[in-house]
Curated annotation (Swiss-Prot):
GO biological process, one term: terpenoid biosynthetic process
Taxonomy, superkingdom: Bacteria
InterPro entries: GHMP_kinase_C_dom (IPR013750), GHMP_kinase_C_sf (IPR036554), GHMP_kinase_N_dom (IPR006204), IspE (IPR004424), Ribosomal_Su5_D2-typ_SF (IPR020568), Ribsml_uS5_D2-typ_fold_subgr (IPR014721)
UniProt keyword list: ATP-binding, Isoprene biosynthesis, Kinase, Nucleotide-binding, Transferase
Protein name: 4-diphosphocytidyl-2-C-methyl-D-erythritol kinase
Active site residues according to the UniProt entry: 18, 145
Species lineage: Bacteria, Pseudomonadati, Pseudomonadota, Alphaproteobacteria, Hyphomicrobiales
Amino acid sequence: MLASTVTGAPLQEQGRAKVNLTLRVVGRRVDGYHDLESVVAFADCADQLTLVPGPELTLTTTGPLAAACGETSDNLVLKAARLLAESVPGLKLGAFELEKVLPVAAGIGGGSADAAAALRLLARLNGLSLDDPRLQAVALKTGADVPVCVPSRACTMTGVGENLQPLALPVLPCVMINPRVPVATKDVFQALGLKPGDLLVGVTDVLTAPSWPTAGASIGDWVSALDQVKNDLEPPALKVQPIIGTVLDALRASHGVLLARMSGSGATCFAIYGSEADAKAAGAQISADHPEWWVHAGTLS
């Protein structure tokens, strides 16, 4: 799908939080990367990225969690933009402004979502399709979670993150919690302890993986299916940061909860509820009990 814009007019995109409803680590490849199988959804909380077209590529960061972003030069927004400029001759660029509201190093792909938002903005500015193979290659080169964040739609994700298949996911009422403790993905995979060439999921497990509900399925149908597949990174993440267990306990003790687990490599955890009212009530109670935590009550889709 092609899009165009008036040069000079500010453009905006959201970097929506990515949530791994399931996450299986199939194994570690000989090149060191991990093969994954994941059901991914996106939340209704997001960073905001603005692009003002201009001659120079820059990035400024604002918002309540701007300080957690670290050095601007290392930001994935700039990495994605530079890689796309290398791949597309004459690419029009400009000044990015990132309003950062999502926790960093949190297992919800905040940096990847921001990079994907940058690619969507540059695609709009330059009349590129999001299916352009150059853009898709840049997304994967920027980071394993960036390809799934480009469309930001519910899907299954396999390989190192490059193989995507859309899913007909209903709107899932949810609460997301981050204890404001960063967890480095590399530390969690190190705690998992797979050597190159090792398998964690056997062939039989792969063949017996559940088929996901189709269009029209209920929240209950999805919870039943999701309950059959765990997050393989949850046990090693608990070793790296035990407070994740406290977060999960709080979610599992909340009224109306149907399923609670960790997203990605943590430390963010989420719970699914039968209604938005239950989710909002649970979020309010947990916020009152733990004012030091980042808590979002909303939906996944």
